[in-house]
């Protein structure tokens, strides 16, 4: 009897819809750069200057930007217990509730203290969703397009950044609270849309199996695969997932401490996740999106808001080639190409910016061009692929804990870079005054990106999450592509898979016989 044909339609719909969580991340990140430069916001939150204008101090500037990342760091760590207890879907919804509290405080807050508290709550929510959304996607996506689907999370981040820049540009000249309350308050709508959709989508079958809800897992698998619950396709998928979870648990406990043990190469996996998320931040991308408006303004550009929108358009557009190539070229080649390209762009920007005056139009055009080239390289490679890699390298039994730590690493470095950048760039007393020379730092970090990818990131293209686990057990990093091909060619899976598959088939047969007996 041939297996019933499967459909990827539901898996693609649910995974792509969940990617809308990235829109919240991107929009919230993108609006703050412009909001801080609004004249009304500076009068409301800033300090009176000797020339009669208002401005935020370097300390307040750093606090407003980086405090969100402090909240997201804590939120990401809380995502594991939330996601493991409530499930992936309702864990995300819990994060959205925290996010909405933060949006409300920022929208209504008329002094800096309330605004900052609102940023903390919003950060908690973004931290939870930024961990659980890629996890939910990776656990539900078909393996042959998993890279593209999880990468769509980053694409939605870029779209959020772009929409935020456009909205801020439209309200920046208002002389009332609406100048910043409108671009911040509209985030209520994004959260409601995502929460409403998640209620209707199936839960992650891998989470359901991990907590012993096998029947619900089979129903969820059937919805995702577009087949009946008693289909052989469901039995096949269920057996592979259950066997991998059984193997992981047979090795011992699944505590946070176990994430750093050599068993099942968990230490290497945890280090890889922590490292790739840290290096994504150290690439310098959020310097552009947190301080881009101010940087372009200092470079002598008449309308830095327009350039900010242009950089966001490039970010959105160039993420698409990355999504199309990740499941064709693979993870490692794209990450290596991206690191090399970003390195070149950073050193050109640093050299031009530090060697050419702001009055030199050709020099400033070159600076802008290579900032845009840098964004293009990042958007097509390290932007989406950091989430793809961390979403697929962990075993199911400890995925929540390891994913929360890697996401927390992203936000910890985000916080550090966000807080330190004004002191690195500004010429104010007590600051380093590096200005464009800060790009030498980002360029040096991109050398680390290249080396880290070469020695620590395996090639996982085309493998199921369970086969990725087998890859780690059977292969070195440098030999991962060869072993990956062997796993695919020989359809390698855990030894326990057939036992789980047989047990499920027998249970279904007994159930059908019971039904027939009752009918008699």
Model-derived segments and their meaning:
Residues 1-225, 229, 239, 243-520:
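Alpha-helical transmembrane bundle of multi-pass membrane proteins
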């Amino acid at each position: 009897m041939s297996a019933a044909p499967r459909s990827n339609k539901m898996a693609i719909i649910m995974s792509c819809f969940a990617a809308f969580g990235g829109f919240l991340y991107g929009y919230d990140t993108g609006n703050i750069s412009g909001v801080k430069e609004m004249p009304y916001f500076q009068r409301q939150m800033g300090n009176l200057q000797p020339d009669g204008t208002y401005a935020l101090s370097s300390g307040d500037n750093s606090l407003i930007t980086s405090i969100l990342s402090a909240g997201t760091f804590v939120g990401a760590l809380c995502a594991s217990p939330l996601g493991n207890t409530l499930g992936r879907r309702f864990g995300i919804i819990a994060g959205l509730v925290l996010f909405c509290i933060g949006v409300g405080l920022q929208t209504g807050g008329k002094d800096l203290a309330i605004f900052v508290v609102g940023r903390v709550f919003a950060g908690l929510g973004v931290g939870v969703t930024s961990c659980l959304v890629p996890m939910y996607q990776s656990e539900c996506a078909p393996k042959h397009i998993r890279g593209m689907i999880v990468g769509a999370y980053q694409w939605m981040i870029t779209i959020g950044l772009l929409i935020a820049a456009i909205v801020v540009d439209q309200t920046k000249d208002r002389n009332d609270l609406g100048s910043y309350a409108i671009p911040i308050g509209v985030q209520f709508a994004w959260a409601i849309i995502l929460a409403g959709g998640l209620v209707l989508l199936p839960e992650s079958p891998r989470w359901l199996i991990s907590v012993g809800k096998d029947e619900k897992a089979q129903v969820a698998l059937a919805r995702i695969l577009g087949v009946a619950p008693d289909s052989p396709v469901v039995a096949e998928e269920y057996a592979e997932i259950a066997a991998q979870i059984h193997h992981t648990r047979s090795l011992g406990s699944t505590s946070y401490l176990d994430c750093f043990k050599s068993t099942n190469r968990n230490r290497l996996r945890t280090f890889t996740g922590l490292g790739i998320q840290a290096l994504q931040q150290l690439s310098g991308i959020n310097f552009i999106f947190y301080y881009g408006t101010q940087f372009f303004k200092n470079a002598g550009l008449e309308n830095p808001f327009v350039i900010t929108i242009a950089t966001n358009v490039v970010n959105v557009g160039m993420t698409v080639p990355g999504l199309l190539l990740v499941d064709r070229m693979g993870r490692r080649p794209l990450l290596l190409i991206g690191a090399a390209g970003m390195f070149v762009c950073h050193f050109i920007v640093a050299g031009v910016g530090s060697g050419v005056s702001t009055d030199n139009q050709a020099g400033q055009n070159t600076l802008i061009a290579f900032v845009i080239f840098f964004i293009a390289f990042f958007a097509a490679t390290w932007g989406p692929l950091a989430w793809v890699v961390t979403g697929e390298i962990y075993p199911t039994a400890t995925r929540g804990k390891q994913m929360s730590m890697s996401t927390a690493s992203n936000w910890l470095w985000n916080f550090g870079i966000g807080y330190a950048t004004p002191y690195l760039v500004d010429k104010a007393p007590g600051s380093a005054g590096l200005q464009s020379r800060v790009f030498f730092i980002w360029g040096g970090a991109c050398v680390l990106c290249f080396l880290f990818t070469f020695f620590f990131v395996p090639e996982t293209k085309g493998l199921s999450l369970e086969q990725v686990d087998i890859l780690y057990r059977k292969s070195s990093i440098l030999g991962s592509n060869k072993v990956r091909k062997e796993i695919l060619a020989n359809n390698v899976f855990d030894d326990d898979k057939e036992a789980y598959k047989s047990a499920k088939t027998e249970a279904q047969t007994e159930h059908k016989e019971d039904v027939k007996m009752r009918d008699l």
